[in-house]
A protein has these predicted regions:
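Cofactor-pocket helix-loop regions in the catalytic cores of large enzyme subunits
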Residues: 1-128, 134, 155-173
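Surface-exposed loop and adjacent secondary-structure segments within mature catalytic domains
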Residues: 6, 128, 135-151
């Protein structure tokens, strides 16, 4: 009732919708492609991949109208910032990786990374899974989701902690 846009898609069609939004963003000239290429690789591959995700085709897959898809893409492009939230259920599907990739693609295409009020935000639960990763409470991680097996990551943490890097073991444990 309070949403400006509500896309009531059919179950399992998130990836198609997100790809159609990306298709519109790119094909309607709503993306600063030079900016995307400064921060990521593979834009030409993405464009080629998205050819199959026209609003007309995806409308039939998702249950949305073609106009809803186009309007949503333009709204995203024109917004000062876009912040996407998803919860653990989004990650518990056979398409979880693709769902996350497509959300991240939308943030990248609209320059909504590393800006105040913008970006993708996973709100995981389950005994504070996200918090455990960020503070290094898992055996293979250091704070900031740095890997113990990565020498550069160990060096960064050792420098911050003021200890010799050899004090941080390179194997989980």
């Amino acid at each position: 009732e309070i949403a400006d846009i509500h896309l009531q898609i059919w179950p399992g069609t998130d990836v198609a919708l997100n790809n159609a939004l990306a298709y519109v963003l790119l094909n309607d000239g709503l993306v600063d492609e030079a900016n995307v290429e400064r921060h990521a690789s593979g834009l030409s591959d993405l464009k080629e991949f998205l050819i199959e995700y026209t609003p007309a085709k995806v409308a039939k897959i998702t249950g949305c109208t073609e106009d809803q898809i186009i309007k949503t893409a333009h709204t995203i492009a024109e917004a000062k910032a876009m912040l996407t939230f998803w919860f653990q259920g989004y990650n518990h599907s056979t398409q979880a990786v693709f769902k996350n990739n497509t959300l991240h693609n939308l943030s990248l295409l609209t320059d909504n990374f590393c800006r105040v009020g913008a970006g993708p935000l996973s709100l995981t639960g389950e005994a504070n899974a996200l918090g455990n990763r960020w503070v290094g409470a898992l055996s293979h991680l250091l704070p900031g989701v740095r890997q113990v097996a990565n020498y550069q990551h160990r060096t960064e943490v050792a420098d911050y902690w003021g200890v010799p890097v050899v004090q941080i073991q390179p194997v989980p444990g």
